[in-house]
């Protein structure tokens, strides 16, 4: 079928889910539905369940759950408060739901991370028979200054890896049959200025890739088969051009922040992105070729994105083909579709949606 649908959320209120239709023959994108959701629950990160019948959202002070009946029929079913620290849900704290990961194996629990202050706990939710977020079954502790921004399972869904941006480390947990998790251990990032934001894993389970937000690089880790802990290989790759001015001369603050990394459907390639902290600068997108064992063979390109990316610039490879990738930005509100062919990347379609906070990550429905 030439028609595909993607759903996208927003960084700021009012809450809405946008459904975009991409035609892979005519190479066009168009907005076909704006679904209103609770106004004070904009979704800054969303993901599907294993069957794409439910959307789970990180929605300010809530974790939200929607039944997806069709690309244009999305129904809000539940919203749950942030678990863990008693102050996380207070209106006067900046604690915010930031990321969630849906298990693909029974019991199909959902693993959620708050961010900023009072974010030292991961939240585990059970789901109903239809996939609705049902109950907060565990609030497992990281450490007081933790701020997890991304997680990934190994291919067997036995081990869970978390990128702790504020505590500057990677955590490993073991998943139990109940869906709850127990701590295995943690390792510090290679450099005090790295701040891991995102993790991706090779389909073999041999290698983990950690995206460093402040370090603006991808660091490669091999998984120790005995301990299941990640071990840094001392191979890293830039996500902004080497030598580019990366500090504001007046404030000393960083000008760029790496964002997201994700593998293509085949597992042969990985894309990663960075954002600029000033609108007059551009973000960057990088592509990598992976060996069959999972190690990074080489960096294929590092190219500027049309805008800074704002809070977003999130890359979203198509989950059933290496050919397509989506990228979103909330500086100007673009969703763009790129084609990956013969190890070259080119944009084929785009649509601008000038709504507040559009667009955060895009998820591929069909």
From Swiss-Prot:
Pfam families: Lactonase (PF10282). InterPro entries: Cycloisomerase_2, Lactonase_7-beta_prop, WD40/YVTN_repeat-like_dom_sf. Keywords: Isomerase. GO terms for molecular function: 6-phosphogluconolactonase activity; carboxy-cis,cis-muconate cyclase activity. It comes from the Eukaryota. The keyword Isomerase applies. It catalyses: 3-carboxy-2,5-dihydro-5-oxofuran-2-acetate = 3-carboxy-cis,cis-muconate. Pathway: Aromatic compound metabolism; beta-ketoadipate pathway; 3-carboxy-cis,cis-muconate from 3-carboxy-2,5-dihydro-5-oxofuran-2-acetate: step 1/1. Homotetramer. Belongs to the cycloisomerase 2 family. Catalyzes a syn cycloisomerization. Also possesses mle activity. This is Carboxy-cis,cis-muconate cyclase.
């Amino acid at each position: 079928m030439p028609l595909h649908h993607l759903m996208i959320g927003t960084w700021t209120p009012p809450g809405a889910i946008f459904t975009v239709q991409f035609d892979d023959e005519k190479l066009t994108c168009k907005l076909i539905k704006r679904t209103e959701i609770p106004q004070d629950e904009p979704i800054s990160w969303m993901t599907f369940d294993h069957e794409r019948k439910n959307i789970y959202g990180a929605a300010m002070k809530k974790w939200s759950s929607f039944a997806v009946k069709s690309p244009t029929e999305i129904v809000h079913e539940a919203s749950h408060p942030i678990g863990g620290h008693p102050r996380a849900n207070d209106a006067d704290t900046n604690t915010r739901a930031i990321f969630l990961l849906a298990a693909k194996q029974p019991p199909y629990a959902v693993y959620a991370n708050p961010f900023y202050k009072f974010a030292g706990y991961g939240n585990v939710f059970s789901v109903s028979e239809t996939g609705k977020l049902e109950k907060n079954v565990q609030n497992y502790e990281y450490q007081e200054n933790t701020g997890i921004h991304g997680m990934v399972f190994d291919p067997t869904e036995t081990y869970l890896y978390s990128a702790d941006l504020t505590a500057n480390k990677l955590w490993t947990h073991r998943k139990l049959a109940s869906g709850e998790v127990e701590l295995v251990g943690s390792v510090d990032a290679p450099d005090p200025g790295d701040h891991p934001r995102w993790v991706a894993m090779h389909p073999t389970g041999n290698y983990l890739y950690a995206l460093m937000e402040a370090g603006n690089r991808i660091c490669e880790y091999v998984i120790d088969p005995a301990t299941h802990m990640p071990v840094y290989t001392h191979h890293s790759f830039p996500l902004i051009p080497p030598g580019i001015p990366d500090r504001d001369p007046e404030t000393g603050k960083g000008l760029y922040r790496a964002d997201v990394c994700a593998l293509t459907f085949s597992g042969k390639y990985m894309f990663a992105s960075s954002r600029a902290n000033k609108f007059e600068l551009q973000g960057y997108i990088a592509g990598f070729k992976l060996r069959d064992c999972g190690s990074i063979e080489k960096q294929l390109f590092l190219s500027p994105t049309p805008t800074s990316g704002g809070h977003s610039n999130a890359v979203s490879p198509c989950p059933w083909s290496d050919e397509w990738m989506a990228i979103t930005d909330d500086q100007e509100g673009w969703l763009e579709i790129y084609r990956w062919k013969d190890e070259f990347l080119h944009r084929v379609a785009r649509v601008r949606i000038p709504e507040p906070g559009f667009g955060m990550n895009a998820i591929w429905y069909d």
